[in-house]
C-alpha cells in the first residue's frame, strides 16, 4: 500500500464532522515532526488548527487544507460506512475522500519525501491546517493568518489542496475565487384581514416587481478571468399563521457571487436603488462572507502547470469557477494562491470517492512543484 493511500485511510477513519478534528491533526503533526518540521497547535474556540514549517529562508511556500468534513447524510444510502475507508474497483470510498483528506494526505507525503531527499533545501515549506472550513470559517485559517501576520511571517506561495479538478486529475486549477455576499431583506407592510385588502398593505404583492427586477438585473459582463456576477434568492418567507390574514412582513434571503469588478458597497447600493424605485418600506442586513481574490498566472501557477503536464500529460485550465475556499484568507497576505487537488465530482455526495491511482499522481505533482519552486 502506498504511503499516501495509507495516510488517507487513517484520516477517513476519523469522523471529523465540522468543526470536530477527531484526531486527524495529531496524525499529520506526528508525521511532519518525524521529518523535522516544527509545529504549533493553534486552537481558537472549539476549532483545531496547526501551523508547521521546515526551513528558514525565502521563498516561503505553504500547503493549506482542512481536516473537517460535512455530515454524511443518510448513511443507508452509502454502499459502505462513510467513515470506513473502502476500496472498490480502483476507487476508495469514504467521507472526505475527495474533500479534502486526499489532498492533505498527498501534500504531507510529498513534503515528507522532499525534506528527506533535500534536508537542507532552499526556502521554507509550511502547512496551515484547520478543522473549520466546512463550517463558519471564523476560527480557522483566518485566525491562523492573523497570527502569522502578527509574527511578521511573509508568505510567498500557497497551494490549497481543495478538489479543483473536473473530469481528470489536473485538468483545472483555481487561480482565484469569486466573493460571496448575503442579504437578509424584510419588506414591511400592514397586517389585515384577507377579505379587506384595502385596509392592509400586502408585502407579498408589493415585492413582486422589485424581486423580478433584481432577478433580471445584469450586474456585469464578467471578464476574461471571472464569469458574470450571480444573484440568487434562496429563501422567501411570509404568512401570519392563518389563512385569512394578510401578513405584516415578507422576509427574503439572497446571495451574490461576484468578481473583483465590483466592491460590495457598489452592489449594495444598486440593490437599494431598485428597492427604492419600487417604493418599498424595507430593512436590509448585509453579510460579506468572503471577498474575491485573483492571483493570476504567476510563478507558482506556471510551475504547477508544468508539473501537471509532466505527470498527467495535460494542459491544465486555470479558472476561478466554483464556491469559496480558505484561499481567500491567505490571499490577503499578498502571496500567490492556487488551488490544486483531486476530481471534485463526488465532494459532499453520498459515496464520496477518489481514484486510487490519482493519489500517487497528486503526490508527485506536489513534490515536483516543490522541486521547481525551491
UniProtKB/Swiss-Prot annotation:
Domain of life the protein comes from: Bacteria
Location of the active site: 68, 133
GO molecular function: acetylornithine deacetylase activity; cobalt ion binding; succinyl-diaminopimelate desuccinylase activity; zinc ion binding
Any Gene Ontology biological process: diaminopimelate biosynthetic process
Source organism of the structure: Coxiella burnetii (strain RSA 331 / Henzerling II)
Residues annotated as binding Zn(2+) 1: 66, 99, 162
Enzyme class: hydrolase
Stated family: Belongs to the peptidase M20A family. DapE subfamily.
Pfam (any one): Peptidase_M20
Keyword terms, alphabetized: Amino-acid biosynthesis, Cobalt, Diaminopimelate biosynthesis, Hydrolase, Lysine biosynthesis, Metal-binding, Zinc
Catalysed conversion reaction: N-succinyl-(2S,6S)-2,6-diaminopimelate + H2O = (2S,6S)-2,6-diaminopimelate + succinate
The protein's annotated pathway: Amino-acid biosynthesis; L-lysine biosynthesis via DAP pathway; LL-2,6-diaminopimelate from (S)-tetrahydrodipicolinate (succinylase route): step 3/3
Record function comment: Catalyzes the hydrolysis of N-succinyl-L,L-diaminopimelic acid (SDAP), forming succinate and LL-2,6-diaminopimelate (DAP), an intermediate involved in the bacterial biosynthesis of lysine and meso-diaminopimelic acid, an essential component of bacterial cell walls.
Source organism phylogeny: Bacteria, Pseudomonadati, Pseudomonadota, Gammaproteobacteria, Legionellales
Protein name: Succinyl-diaminopimelate desuccinylase
E.C. code: 3.5.1.18
Binding residue positions for Zn(2+) 2: 99, 134, 348
Cofactor(s) for this UniProt protein: Zn(2+); Co(2+)
Cofactor binding, per record: Binds 2 Zn(2+) or Co(2+) ions per subunit.
Keyword Zinc attached: yes
Subunit architecture: Homodimer.
